[in-house]
Amino acid sequence: MTTVISNITSLKDAIESRNAEGVSAWYADNAVLTILDRDNPPAAPTTYRGLEEIGAYYRDICGRNMEHSVEDLVSTDGGLGYTQRCRYPDGSRVVCVTVARLVDGKITRQTAVQVWDASGS
């Protein structure tokens, strides 16, 4: 079993416990995170470049009062993917599907597509 596959649960645990530093530790210094959603379509996605920007993004997300669960987590030596389900206290839900490329056990490129339910749905 490779290091990536044996340690992948640490990424799941970091996401579910809202541990921004634990999530950020999975990224290479020069990583690129691209997020697509209703407000940020393929022509104008949100893009975070480098560990500093990605870390700030996760500190914001992990600092929010919401529940996170990770499902369908798969990994290989060269990549990983998972579905993340989030729920805010008001009942609003977010589902995010992500795929990422790994080099030397670190995420170098990630694309995430996220959608929301209406509040309380």
Name each model feature, range by range.
Residues S17, E21, E53, T108:
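Short, flexible micro-motifs
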Residues M1-A25, D29, S119-S121:
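Short, low-complexity N-terminal intrinsically disordered segments enriched in polar/charged residues
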Residues A56-S121:
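A beta-strand edge to alpha-helix "cap/lid" segment located at domain peripheries
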Residues V4, I8, P41-P42, I54, ...:
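Hydrophobic aliphatic residue packing
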Residues G22, W26-T76:
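A solvent-exposed, acidic/Ser-Thr-rich amphipathic alpha-helical stretch
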